[in-house]
């Protein structure tokens, strides 16, 4: 066992364990079956009304022997429900695939004698697993080492903090789980430890008693709610108009004698026809596709955003990112490369080199793998790399100096302390490293304050992170006791460089051009933070002053009323603590800002929760990730800028779908209403209307959701969070295009009535095709809404859009040419097809011309 604790499993043992005990995956809870989801579609009130109409039509078909229209209605209903079911099922599967990313979280294990990181799914029974503050326990296991280890078991027992130890004398006999046992899904709230995996996957306690959590939020997004209300409002209008049309057509039939023929079969057929027309109009008028467009757009966007290193954990974050006005960002790893390197170590006390190496090695929780890659905190890793370069084996130093107690680093205390039994001195030592001003306050006076401060300012002016190291002899068992009256020796200061990411200055410029304020909230010193801000283009010595920066201490000392006057101008908060970040978020929100916040530590969870969008780091703790809405897999600020672009583009695409659908709703309701009032019956059959409805709801939603993000949206200011989705420009477009559609369609009907009397089958077929192709070309107008280029721009990036259009066009031609009595159509000549397509295309051509003229006369901010 002792050898195993040091060496871990071999590669062969890992494979054998996986064969015997399986993967570390919890089987997802069994969701609704595909059949149940399909059946759910028939609970829609609109579908139920259609089914009633279909049954009545079937009854009449048995009487007169004409089944074609009934078959067409039933097929159309099934097609409509199948298409909706398919897209809902596809979206659900996409969300499930995103959930699997949770099992790719890296876990530190020892294999073949080397510390390495593997995905959580690859942890096996027998693995030697290392866990530390903020991490989630990946499997059930037994502790073999514990240093000040505290576990949050609230997911299993409700206990937020349970002490864990390997010392049997300290075991809690009343604990729910043994004091040396760790359970999958619990989190480390303090300390660190090593355990041997005893159960993985479904055999863990979590696998038996809990259900797998889902990334997809059950709470509807604000935009979904807005569109649902809009859909219901328009639906009520459509139902009211349908009732009015039913009454008007009923009165017309009664006055025309169609209901008083004495033939009950004929009378029933006429009543059924009137009823079917009214029902069909309700189907067309109710824009039930609006809420579905949100789900579809979010599903597609979440998958695409994953490719740009944005893992969306909560659906609302996609749309909210588009409204963000302030980004509060960390410095390390987000703005910088997080590739720490010790540039220089300044010694302030003469001690043995091995003792300094021992102090650095044991007072750390980081590791180096076989390739010298850092596992754990990058700053601590840089110190270990420096030890290796100087010829010291940090692992051997740790092994030879047993740990008595440890106080882990937190952003509140800004230091880490460890009590060891030193082999170098043969005595018990308390070792401390952390922020120089904090560590120096623990040390004995040495008359070097001015020298130390001068050197620190030089390092900070070069944007370097600084860590101080100190130690003292002690007899205490606990760090808290040893630090009550510390008289430590101030040994050295390490200057650690972390270059700015090359892509960050451009990303910051993009966000600032998009009207988004950037605020650096960091635990580093003011000088270091200011230099980083200068390098990324956020800080300008000519225009910025002390009003644009403050420390966490200054921030905490001010009242909310005082801060409300300064928070919007603030660019840098240095030496900040997590509660400072949370308070800053709340103050900014009180000023009406939409705030996105980055965080990677357990203590960042409150700020991530309170922010409108919480952005956790891929390298951050599990607690931070669980509290966030989006995880930046590459930790980069550039990914934040990409998320903003995605959010704005998503909102714009949904607006385009709303524009498209409401234009058709407007035209359809007016045409049928006016037609019925003036005695012109509805020239579209129920089956035709259902086909049109499929185009309006499903195909259009897919087409608009598939449009690629437009970088030009980053040249515009943020939209108000509570902005109504139908803007004045959209309302004007809906009214203008809808009026043109009404004029064209009613003009055709009245012209034919005046010249030929009754409408022929050929005329009805042409009318049906014109109606569909007006929608076809109007999709181009919707695509061009608020665009900076012609609708034909970026054909390659809009492949799905054009494929959907092709599907609609081919479907319409096939229906007309081969639909026959079922769709009440007759084949058209190629000349007629050219006329239909050519004349209706004018709506797209003229729309593009008008938009082009407007762009020249009054360029939009995003297109300049």
What is the role of each PLM region?
Residues 1-717, 725-726, 739, 753-754, ...:
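Conserved cytosolic headpiece of P-type ATPases
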Residues 750-759:
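Long hydrophobic segments that form regular secondary structure
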Residues 696, 741-742, 765-780:
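Generic alpha-helical transmembrane segments
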Residues 718-734:
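The cytoplasmic-loop to transmembrane-helix boundary for the fourth helix
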Residues 707, 732-748, 773:
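Alpha-helical transmembrane segments of multi-pass integral membrane proteins
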Residues 760-764:
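Transmembrane alpha-helix entry/boundary detector in multi-pass membrane proteins
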